[in-house]
Amino acid sequence: MKDDVLKQQAHAAIQKKLGYAFRDISLLRQALTHRSHHAKHNERFEFVGDSILNYTVARMLFDAFPKLTEGELSRLRASLVNEGVLAEMAAEMNVGDGLYLGAGELKSGGFRRPSILADAMEAMFAAVSFDADFNTAEKVVRHLFAERVRRVDFQNQAKDGKTALQEALQARRFALPKYRIEEQIGHANDSMFVISCDLGELGFVCRAKGTSRKAAEQEAAKEALKWLEEKLPLKKKKK
C-alpha cells in the first residue's frame, strides 16, 4: 500500500514536469514499466516515442538553424537525442522513482541505469500520443527540449566528439588519439564499457564510461577535447 502511494506521488510529479496530465493513467504506468517487471512493458512504446522525439527535435533544429546543411543538422540532432541527454532529463524529472522494475533490476540499481531511464522517456512521449494525439506529444517534447535547443553550441556539438577532437589535434599539428578498451563490465546484453583516450606526446590520458564502445569513445573524446582547448587554445586570427 505504501509503495502504491509513493508511485502515485512520483507519477503526479512526473506529469507536472512533462506539462501533461494523463486521462488514462495506465498508459503512463506502461511507459514506466520495464520488461523485467511485467509482460505488458514499454518496449513497443519506445519504438513510437523514438520517432516522435526524432521528428520533433529535427523540426526544432530545422527552424532554429536555417543555414545548416542536412549533415550538420543530423549531427546536431545526434548531440541532443541520445541516451545521455535523455537519461539526464529523466534524472532531473525523478523518473526513476516512478519506474516499475523486476526484483533483479531493482536490486542492481536499474532505476538509475541510463539506458532504462532513456527508454522510459521515449516511451512516455508515445504514451502522450496514445492518450491524446501526435500534436500534444510534440508539444511535450518541445517543452522539454526548448532550453537545450536554445543553448546548444553549434560549433562544438554539430560534430561528434571524436571528429571534433581529431580536427582540434590536426589544427595544432599533433598526432591522432588512440582509444583502448580498459574494462567491460556486465553481460553481453547489459554491458558497460570503460574506454581510454590517449593523446600521446601531449601526455594526457582520460577515461570514460558508456553502454557501448562507441558511446564511451565519444565521451572520452569530449573530455580530451575539453582538456586540449583549455591547455592549448588556438589563437584567433586577426581580421
Swiss-Prot record:
It comes from the Bacteria. Its main location: cytoplasm. Its cofactor is Mg(2+). The keyword Cytoplasm applies. Mg(2+) binds at E46, D119, E122. Keywords: Cytoplasm, Endonuclease, Hydrolase, Magnesium, Metal-binding, mRNA processing, Nuclease, RNA-binding, rRNA processing, rRNA-binding, tRNA processing. GO terms for biological process: mRNA processing; regulation of gene expression; rRNA processing; tRNA processing. It catalyses: Endonucleolytic cleavage to 5'-phosphomonoester. Pfam families: dsrm, Ribonucleas_3_3. Belongs to the ribonuclease III family. Homodimer. This is Ribonuclease 3. It comes from Neisseria meningitidis serogroup A / serotype 4A (strain DSM 15465 / Z2491).
